C-alpha cells in the first residue's frame, strides 16, 4: 500500500527518517520544516551540512516550509524534540487529514505533566490515532543507509503493522508492537542511564561499573514500565535494551557525552546547544517513580547530580551502600 508521508522536523533525525523512507520508494515523502531558509537550501543542495554533513538526500524527497504541506499526508511523523511536540501539535493539527495517523519520534516525557508523548498528542489531537517510533538508531547511521532496526507501537496492532510496512526499507527495519507505554518509557529512561554511564566514563570509574549500571538500569526500567502499565518483555527488546546498549556505549550519543562532561567536573547546561533529552527526563522520571513507590536509585542519583544536590562521590557511596538484596 502506497502512503503519503510527511516528516515534520528538519533536524538530524527528521531529515534522516525522511531520506530513508524516500529511498524505499514505496511512498511519497515530504520533509516539513519551520525554517524557510533551511528548506530552500535543502531543495537546492540536497544536503543538510549542519545536521548530516556529507550525506546527500534522495531526489525523490520533497521539501516544504508551510504547515499546510501536511494536508495530504496519511502518516505524519513528528520528529522534533519531546518538549516541542505539544506546540507542534497545535501548529500542525489544523492541517491534518481526517484519517491521518500521527507518529511521535521523540524520546522523552512531557516535563510539565509527566505524561507520555502519545498521551499528550491524544490530548491535543483527539481525532487522530497516535503511534510512537523508538529504538536504537542514530540519525547519521540511518541517513547513510547503515542497517538499523527500531520499534513502532500503536494501541491497534493493525495500525502498528501498517506503519511498519510503510516506513521500513532495505536498510531500515521496523518491528510492530502494541505496547506504546513500554516503547516510550524505554526510549526516555535509557537516556537517563546513558548519562549515568557517561559519568562513569568521564570520572574514570571503570568498565565494571558501566556494566553494572546497564544491568541494574535495565531492572529499573522494567520495574517502572510495569508499574505504568507496560510490558516487561518490551524493555528487553529494541526500544529498551537495544537502545540502552547503543546510547550507553557510543560517543554519538548526546546523553553519554553530557554524562562524560559531568564526570570530568565540567559545567554543562543541558538546555544549551543540542538538547540532552535525558537531563530533562531524569527529574520527571524520579518524581513519577516516587509517586508509584518504584525503586529507581540510579535515576534518582542522576537527577540529584544534574540538579547539584549530590556530587558524584556521594552518589556512588549511596548506590554502593544500599541494603543488600536479591537480584
Swiss-Prot record:
Major location (coarse): cytoplasm
One GO MF term: glycerol-3-phosphate dehydrogenase [NAD(P)+] activity
* Underlying gene: gpsA
Q: Which family does it belong to?
A: Belongs to the NAD-dependent glycerol-3-phosphate dehydrogenase family.
Under the heading InterPro entries, the entry gives: 6-PGluconate_DH-like_C_sf, 6PGD_dom2, G3P_DH_NAD-dep, G3P_DH_NAD-dep_C, G3P_DH_NAD-dep_N, NAD(P)-bd_dom_sf
Q: Does the keyword Protease apply?
A: no
**What is this protein's name?**
Glycerol-3-phosphate dehydrogenase [NAD(P)+]
Keywords in UniProt for this one? Cytoplasm, Lipid biosynthesis, Lipid metabolism, NAD, NADP, Nucleotide-binding, Oxidoreductase, Phospholipid biosynthesis, Phospholipid metabolism
Q: Which organism is it from?
A: Rhizobium leguminosarum bv. trifolii (strain WSM2304)
List the NCBIfam families hit by this protein, alphabetically.
PRK00094.1-2, PRK00094.1-4
Pfam families to which the protein is assigned, alphabetical? NAD_Gly3P_dh_C (PF07479), NAD_Gly3P_dh_N (PF01210)
Q: What is its EC number?
A: 1.1.1.94
A GO CC annotation given for this chain = cytosol
